[in-house]
């Protein structure tokens, strides 16, 4: 039996292991998105890209491994912050596969994000812990697993830099343009 996922998924799969079966488990898969500088060509384009990124991030309230947890954005701090603000607005929307208010972030995320609020301007946070969505801009990937509509945005000077954030655990990469 081969299973991918976090602790609860592996525990559930282990129930089916019996004589003649062996459990082979793999870490959860993580998806990301990459947004190119072209997103900033107009306000309309930026809003469209923020909507697309929100769609990528909120599938099944981010429970699906194909939901983006990290988004690398090519741009300067002002541009990336504008994207983050628009993304935050779009996370809290009812969708076919996501609710406006999903599960609230767990204590690990809350504690880490509260600490990051004191580290501006290097880190910046949009949103609260009410389940409507949270965006964290940081100079590198955060050291917690973003879930429950929590998105980590990482500014990059060039799109090729985003490749360094992909690992063996990366499942899907959304790309704009």
Model region roles, listed by residue range:
Residues 177:
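Short secondary-structure boundary segments
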Residues 60-174:
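NAD(P)-dependent aldehyde/semialdehyde dehydrogenase
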Residues 1-70, 75:
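Conserved NAD(P)+-binding/catalytic subdomain of aldehyde/semialdehyde dehydrogenases
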């Amino acid at each position: 039996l081969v299973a991918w996922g976090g602790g609860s998924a592996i525990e559930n799969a282990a129930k089916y292991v019996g004589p003649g079966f062996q459990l082979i488990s793999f870490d959860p898969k993580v998806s990301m998105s990459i947004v190119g500088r072209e997103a900033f060509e107009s306000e309309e384009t930026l809003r469209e890209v923020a909507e697309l990124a929100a769609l990528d991030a909120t599938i099944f309230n981010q429970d699906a491994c194909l939901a983006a947890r990290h988004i690398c954005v090519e741009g300067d701090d002002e541009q990336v912050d504008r994207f983050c603000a628009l993304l935050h607005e779009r996370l809290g929307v009812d969708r076919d596969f996501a609710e406006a208010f999903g599960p609230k972030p767990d204590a690990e995320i809350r504690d880490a994000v509260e600490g990051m609020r004191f580290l501006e301007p290097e880190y910046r946070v949009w949103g609260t812990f009410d389940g409507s969505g949270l965006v964290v801009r940081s100079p590198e990937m955060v050291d917690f697993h973003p879930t429950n509509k929590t998105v980590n945005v990482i500014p990059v000077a060039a799109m090729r830099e985003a490749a360094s954030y992909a690992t063996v655990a990366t499942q899907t990469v959304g790309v704009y343009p």
